[in-house]
């Protein structure tokens, strides 16, 4: 007989299930978090590890009662980090939707611009952050995630830009200016409940420049609108400028792109006229067979130059943003982005003080209705047994550990800023403790599960029914094991591997991405620790 299990999202654990003893309140008492020796440490030398949840969109601006209850609930579970994620999302009407609430959004979209804070939303955001800090829960702050650029923002081209648009925020100068403005306003605003700005608060673990973005990422049709046409043209123009800088003339480019009499440069393509096509991206860096068809749309020569260009654009943008955040006074590690898998893409994000990645197994990728995933039977829809089948995204196998490990870089701390498994039991129920154990083996620094809840209220989601597969607040497989997971990971109860395997990339390796690229991550992190090493000068490796 099936029986419903009731798990309320805002009721604190009590008795032996109260894991608040794992926390050391208030957050920040050991000083600012630092990146050193490849890991996160507090200022007083204490090793820092973090396990917690994302709270997305409208969940960032709860009313005071909800903030009090959720902080108490999280602390009782042993949660010591919350990622305040996508607080910049546009307003949505439907309760529980992945959007900001109309009553108190962080950004005042109703004013016709995304450049102003809504006073009520900012006050709620401040209060929530203060209550989390009070309980010993640290903060992961991200900047641009879901922002919808409005025409009133003074955009360079007519119209705005859709929410969650990718790639162009790394290219367009006006978008970059607006990101810096938002960073300054958010990070330097003094929270009246703590007396500190986020930039000065040791309760902040890291500041993430953007979410799931890269100069070589595609939009999967999300940029097809007429208002995005000049942004698409800007990327092509930048690529052609890069080719001219490298080759000087079309003839030199043609010579470089010719092999065995086959030229990859079309007769109509000329970098001086800005007509050389780039590579269309996707969720991840697209694959490229180095022995593939030479004049294919993603042939080896075109691909190699576009990856070199993408690395240049990523590093230029992230170095600039990181310098600006430090100029504002940041004292904690700054991370570039996440959801990165290809070798060139990972290398292009290594200017951050730590590395992060997102990793999912059995991700539904279902159609969105009213800006959220509310579907019947999503777990049944996506269930794949990882013991018998591993799906692939480009060159990457999508088991949690193998996909996450693609972005680990030697000498950098590492966290999963989003991860989850969405299939049915029995493998769903084992995925979470298993991940915590392997994270210990590989000596990772943080695991932030996506997503605890999507609501600004503590009492408007059912305790005994899963309506949104992405909200785990009442998922028995997650919640019933969480305290044990917290003990395992935060205490390091699984020993770190005795040996570490370095996976080496030369600069030439970054110009291609064969299908077997991710093969090392399907094996090494399960038996030992592994890190990626990128050689900046020559091919000599001193291990």
Predicted feature residues:
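N-terminal pre-domain segments of enzymes
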Residues: 1-30
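Short, charged, surface-exposed secondary-structure boundary motifs
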Residues: 364-371
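Short acidic/polar alpha-helix capping motifs at helix-coil junctions
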Residues: 2-4, 283-288, 399-402
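Active-site mouth of glycoside hydrolases
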Residues: 27-323, 327-352
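Catalytic-core region of carbohydrate-active enzymes that cleave or remodel glycosidic bonds
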Residues: 132, 188, 314-336, 341-364, ...
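Short N-terminal signal/transit or membrane-insertion segments
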Residues: 11-19, 139-147, 276-290, 374-393
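Generic structural signal of hydrophobic/aromatic residues within well-ordered alpha-helices
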Residues: 19, 239, 243, 253, ...
């Amino acid at each position: 007989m099936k029986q419903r299990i009731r798990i309320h999202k805002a009721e604190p654990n009590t008795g032996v299930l109260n894991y608040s003893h794992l926390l050391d309140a208030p957050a920040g008492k050991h000083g600012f978090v630092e990146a050193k020796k490849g890991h996160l440490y507090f200022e007083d030398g204490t090793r820092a590890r973090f396990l917690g949840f994302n709270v997305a969109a409208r969940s960032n601006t709860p009313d005071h009662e909800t903030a009090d209850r959720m902080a108490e609930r999280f602390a009782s579970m042993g949660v010591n980090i919350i990622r305040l994620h996508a607080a910049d999302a546009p307003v949505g009407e439907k309760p529980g939707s992945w959007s900001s609430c109309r009553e108190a959004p962080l950004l005042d979209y109703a004013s016709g611009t995304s450049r102003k804070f809504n006073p009520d939303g900012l006050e709620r955001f401040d209060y929530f952050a203060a209550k989390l800090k009070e309980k010993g829960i640290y903060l992961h702050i991200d900047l641009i995630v879901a922002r919808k650029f409005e025409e009133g923002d003074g955009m360079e081209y007519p119209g705005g830009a859709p929410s969650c648009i990718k790639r162009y925020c790394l290219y367009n100068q006006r978008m970059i200016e607006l990101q810096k403005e938002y960073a300054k306003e958010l990070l330097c605003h003094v929270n009246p409940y703590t007396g500190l700005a986020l930039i000065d608060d040791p309760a902040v673990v890291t500041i993430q420049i953007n979410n799931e973005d890269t100069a070589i990422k595609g939009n999967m049709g999300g940029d097809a609108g007429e208002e995005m046409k000049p942004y698409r043209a800007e990327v092509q123009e930048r690529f052609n400028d890069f080719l001219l800088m490298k080759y000087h003339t079309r003839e030199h480019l043609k010579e470089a792109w010719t092999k065995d009499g086959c030229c990859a440069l079309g007769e109509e393509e000329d970098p001086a006229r800005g007509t050389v096509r780039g590579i269309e991206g996707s969720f991840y860096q697209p694959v490229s067979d180095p022995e593939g068809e030479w004049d294919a749309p993603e042939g080896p020569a075109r691909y190699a130059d576009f990856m070199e260009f993408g690395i240049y654009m990523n590093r230029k943008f992230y170095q600039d943003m990181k310098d600006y955040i430090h100029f504002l006074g940041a004292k904690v590690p700054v991370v570039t982005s996440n959801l990165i898998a290809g070798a060139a893409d990972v290398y292009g994000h290594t200017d951050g003080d730590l590395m992060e990645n997102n990793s999912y197994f059995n991700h539904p990728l279902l159609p969105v209705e009213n800006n959220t995933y509310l579907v019947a039977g999503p777990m049944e829809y996506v269930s794949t047994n990882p013991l018998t089948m591993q799906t692939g995204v480009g060159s990457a196998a999508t088991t949690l550990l193998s996909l996450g490990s693609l972005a680990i870089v030697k000498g950098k701390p590492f966290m999963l800023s989003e991860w989850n498994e969405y299939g049915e039991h029995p493998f769903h129920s084992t995925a979470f403790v298993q991940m915590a154990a392997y994270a210990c083996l590989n000596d990772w620094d943080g695991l932030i599960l996506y997503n605890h809840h999507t609501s600004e209220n503590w009492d408007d989601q059912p305790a005994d029914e899963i309506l949104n597969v992405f909200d785990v607040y009442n998922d028995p497989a997650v919640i019933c094991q969480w305290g044990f997971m917290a003990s395992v990971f935060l205490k390091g109860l699984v020993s770190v591997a005795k040996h570490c395997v370095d996976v080496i990339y030369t600069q030439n390796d970054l110009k291609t991405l064969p299908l077997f690229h991710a093969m090392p991550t399907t094996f090494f992190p399960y038996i030992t620790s592994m890190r990626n090493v990128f050689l900046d000068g020559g091919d000599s490796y001193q291990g």
